[in-house]
A protein has these predicted regions:
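Active-site alpha-helix of zinc metalloproteases
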Residues: 555, 577, 645, 802-807
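Short turn/helix-capping motifs enriched in Asx and small/polar residues
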Residues: 387, 572-589, 598, 613-614, ...
Length: 942
């Protein structure tokens, strides 16, 4: 352990705060274990405008040497909204926003333009797009349910019920009472090239694939808590789920095309932190997880059936949670070419937690490229040999060199003015201008394989074989409105016959077809996550290979990253066994037959490997032989200023689910677990139960509706002005009105990112080891990932949607508006089930603080004093808020002067939630109990 920790000596992380309390720079120190020099500082800078808006970021590499090249620059509106953003990696984006902050038009460096149309309620109606030299095409149209009886019977009122998008038409026939779809259908466009949606629905349908068999309908049934009880996919295959009292999966079953029900998983056991400890798969394999009682890290992951040990992974960590070894004790020690080959992987990191070396096992035929190594069949671990890989990175985090045992080193050339990189070719100068488009998308995968991109910077096509004057071999992709792939088509020419290999991705189902004029193979891949195992059932409608049993079940046993290590059949016999290099390349794979392993589609990190050699991650494609993404991060700076870097060069510990959640194991998470005493139950939505995600979505939706209503009320006139006086003081609150409108608009725009944008997965779910801990949520104001940490109490009760909405407004205001916690209102009023009773209670609590009643001034002084003592507020901030930083003057003013109290309340996070509920709470009347008489509109306090 001494060797592990010595590299971190004299390498602190420093944060430089300007007099306004803004983070001006971050300094980290880089050192490797074999370094003989002093640690090298690397400085990341943030530059702000006079009002405090972030206008530029500088990274350590591009700003080195005194010639500062800004990695990202921004031009902001007067209210702080970003109008123009420019990245050295991703090019520029220009947005035109309306008075509500919604984007109406958008342009980029490729000459693409997008126009957005909204209705009076702020809902999108249509999206038009055009390229630099192409026509305007309406590529999306939205249709909503009205309020008539034919809509209310299906819970369609106000819901998006038909969406003509980039792949076809998505329609929802029924919604449940909780807003989840009960029945939805997908139809695909006949042609891959979008010709634009006409306004008439019949004309739209004419552009879709004809026939009833081309309407793919999925159905669900939910519990009262929103848990999925039954899912019937588009081919009629059904999955059934059962949960325990805590909402955790207890068992799952599968029914294939009206045949007998098959048990997929059962006997699941969880520990006090909600983490799974044991489960039994349908093939009899018992999986067990062992956690370290000191830090809750997983130490052992095993799977066995009877006396057969199928998997036994033992993990060892450094003090901050980096994995330093993985020992598979289910595998034997072997000998190859006079070398002892142990089934152990070892890892070493630099002071920035970047992986710099790894050892493990490989097959001799493995290479550094997009292809797979030769299959070992039958399974024979004795054919594996040792390997050593080492990596070097530049100051910007670009992987510039990979050395591999006795093979030639692999180098990357990085552009001097960006992070765009190309494989080094000896004797050839890299042409970054010709290899990337203006938006930073790679145009050539490998020599001879061109790539084409959509207006939304999604990979549209890869030319696999170019034939002048003849049809190319290619693979093409279609995406839905959310940016997720829903269709893949590969065409290949052989013996003058064009064959098509196509995949349609539907909820829980992949329909894979292959053929020339007609499909001679039709395969349904039925997918479900049954506890630990990712279960896939192969159901052939046509063309089943004779070597594969009918309706073959495949259980995938994964490692800690979710990579598919073993595939087992229904008798727990081995189908395939695979190992991976740290950056995702296949180091070796074994299987019992060539035919069976052909149908292994999911590999590294649980992602699908395309014929191109790229892994599809949901929003981007990853090239494992390059160790980087092939296009910039669509969320821009959510995970640093290098938009091509993969999981911060720590692929052993960090996992990118969709390219959305970031920050695993960083300094904030360490503080959460080791200082604050919480245990992290899950990161992002994918690691939570459906019921938890549903409650979170309800809270976000409620908060967004309240913010929208608050802005509308404040802008409409003076009807709610006295509500402002209730919160901030009589005759004072009205003066805050213009500033409040701007700040609520900023909050509303930020909530869009948490509902459907780049921050959708930036939630961390916690369990407190202290039973009496009443905390619901918190944030770290300087967190570059803008995460919201939620305790289990915040998302465990469907009756507390209102509490959750106010909590989310409170926490996000810290991140967006730099608010403080000067005062907390009592939560007693929130328990009132009557809307008018709630308003009366909130009004009373607001006046307690604004009028200085019930000792509230003393509470404010105590909170303020604690913030100063903990250095959570600077003297400069105090002067900006109150005009003085003298605590005695502040205490005296808050006790006696309403103006002092009003300033404290104006910058108080809880006051933003309180004001929103008092002014815009009418948007949530449906959350309260129904009275026999219609509930009247809330009367303003004139």
């Amino acid at each position: 352990m001494e060797f592990v920790t010595v590299v971190h000596r004299h390498t602190p992380q420093l944060s430089l705060i300007d007099p306004r309390g803004l983070a001006a720079a971050t300094v980290v120190y880089h050192q490797t274990p074999d370094s003989v020099t002093r640690p090298a500082p690397r400085t990341t800078r943030q530059i702000y405008s006079v009002p405090g808006h972030l206008v530029a970021n500088q990274d350590p590499r591009l700003s080195a040497g005194g010639v500062g090249v800004d990695a990202v620059t921004r031009v902001n509106s007067l209210s702080g909204a970003v109008l123009l953003a420019q990245s050295v990696d991703a090019g520029w984006r220009l947005s035109l926003q309306d008075e509500t902050g919604q984007v109406r038009q958008q342009w980029d460096g490729m000459g693409n333009m997008s126009c957005f149309e909204f209705d009076g309620m702020g809902r999108p109606l249509s999206i038009e797009q055009s390229t630099a030299h192409g026509p305007d095409l309406c590529i999306e149209r939205f249709y909503y349910g009205s309020c008539g009886p034919e809509f209310s019977q299906r819970n369609h009122c106000g819901q998006l019920i038909r969406h003509a998008d980039t792949a076809g038409v998505h329609a929802v026939a029924h919604f449940g009472l909780q807003g989840a779809p009960l029945e939805e259908s997908r139809r695909f466009l006949t042609e891959f090239e979008h010709v634009g949606w006409p306004a008439n629905e019949d004309e739209q349908d004419a552009l879709l694939e004809p026939g009833a068999d081309k309407i793919y309908t999925t159905r669900w049934q939910y519990s009262v808590l929103g848990e999925s009880l039954l899912q019937i996919d588009a081919a009629g295959h059904a999955r059934r789920y059962r949960y325990d009292l805590a909402g955790q999966l207890e068992a799952a079953w599968l029914v294939v095309a009206d045949k007998d029900e098959r048990l997929l998983v059962s006997d699941q056991m969880y520990n006090a932190s909600g983490k799974i400890e044991q489960e039994k798969a349908g093939n009899g394999v018992i999986s067990m997880w062992t956690y370290d009682p000191a830090d809750d890290r997983m130490r052992q992951l095993s799977a066995r059936k009877g006396g057969r040990v199928l998997q036994d992974l033992r993990y060892d960590y450094d003090p901050v949670g980096n994995i330093i070894s993985m020992d598979d004790q289910s595998q034997p020690v072997t000998w190859f070419a006079n070398q002892r080959v142990d089934p152990i992987n070892r890892y070493c990191y630099d002071s920035l937690y970047q992986l710099i070396s790894a050892t493990g096992r490989e097959v001799a035929s493995a290479g550094n490229g997009p292809g797979l190594p030769g299959l070992i069949s039958p399974v024979d671990p004795s054919r594996l040999q040792n390997y050593l890989q080492t990596w070097s990175y530049d100051a910007g985090g670009n992987r510039i060199e990979q050395r591999h045992s006795d093979r030639p080193s692999h180098f990357m050339d990085i552009a001097p003015d960006s992070n765009r990189g190309l494989v080094r070719v000896e004797g050839k100068e890299p042409d970054f201008g010709a290899s990337f488009d203006s938006n930073g998308n790679l145009k050539v995968l490998v020599p001879g394989q061109l790539m084409r991109w959509t207006v939304r910077n999604q990979l549209a096509e890869v030319i696999l074989v170019h034939r002048p004057g003849a049809e190319n071999d290619s693979e093409r992709y279609l995406y839905d409105s959310a940016g997720l792939r829903v269709r893949k088509l590969r065409t290949l020419l052989a013996a003058k016959v064009t064959r098509k290999v196509q995949v349609r991705y539907l909820p829980g189902l992949e329909i894979r077809t292959e053929g020339a004029d007609t499909d001679d193979e039709v395969l349904h891949v039925i997918t479900t996550q049954a506890g630990r195992s990712s279960v896939r059932l192969l159901h052939w409608k046509e063309g089943r290979p004779s070597e594969i049993s009918k309706d073959q079940l495949r259980y995938s046993l994964d490692d800690l990253l979710g990579s598919s290590a073993l595939e087992l059949d229904e008798q727990a016999d081995l189908i395939s066994y695979e190992g991976y290099y740290p950056y995702g390349g296949t180091a070796w794979w074994m299987g019992r037959s060539q035919v069976e392993v052909k149908y292994k589609f999911v590999r590294y990190s649980g992602k699908e490997l395309d014929v191109t050699g790229l892994y599809y991650y949901g929003f981007r494609y990853y090239a494992p032989w390059l160790g980087r993404w092939i296009n910039p991060d669509p969320a821009w700076g959510i995970d640093g200023l290098n938009f091509y870097k993969m999981v911060r060069n720590n692929p052993i510990v960090l996992r990118d689910e969709f390219g959305l959640y970031s920050g695993v194991g960083d300094i904030d998470e360490i503080a959460v677990e080791q200082v604050l005493g919480y245990r992290i139950l899950g990161r992002g939505r994918s690691q939570q139960t459906p019921s938890t995600n549903l409650l979170l979505d309800r809270g976000l939706d409620a908060a967004q509706r309240v913010l929208h209503q608050t802005i509308a009320e404040l802008e409409s006139g003076s009807a709610m002005d006295t509500r402002l006086d209730d919160v901030y003081g009589k005759g004072i609150g009205i003066g805050f009105k213009p500033a409040l409108i701007n700040w609520y608009k900023k909050l509303r725009n930020e909530f869009v990112s948490y509902i459907s944008g780049s921050n959708r997965d930036q939630f961390v779910f916690l369990n407190s080891v202290q039973k009496k801990n009443s905390t619901l949520a918190f944030v770290f104001p300087q967190d570059k990932h803008r995460r919201v940490f939620l305790t289990a109490k915040a998302v465990q009760d469907e009756k507390k949607t209102l509490n959750l909405a106010m909590t989310l407004i409170h926490e996000v205001s810290h991140l967006v508006l730099n608010t403080h916690d000067f005062y907390y209102y009592s939560e007693a009023a929130l328990s009132n089930e009557d809307y008018h009773g709630l308003l009366d209670g909130l009004k009373y609590e607001a006046e307690v603080a604004s009028k200085g009643l019930e000792g509230s001034p003393s509470d404010i002084v105590k909170k303020l004093t604690a913030l100063v003592a903990d250095k959570k507020i600077s003297d400069r901030e105090l002067v900006g808020i109150f005009g003085t930083a003298n605590l005695s003057t502040l205490a005296r003013g808050i006790e006696t002067d309403p103006q002092f109290r009003s300033r404290a309340l104006f910058y108080n996070a809880d006051s933003f939630s309180m004001t929103a509920m008092l002014v815009g709470g009418g948007a949530l009347r449906n959350l309260f109990r129904h009275n026999s008489n219609p509930m009247p509109e809330p009367e303003p306090d004139y």
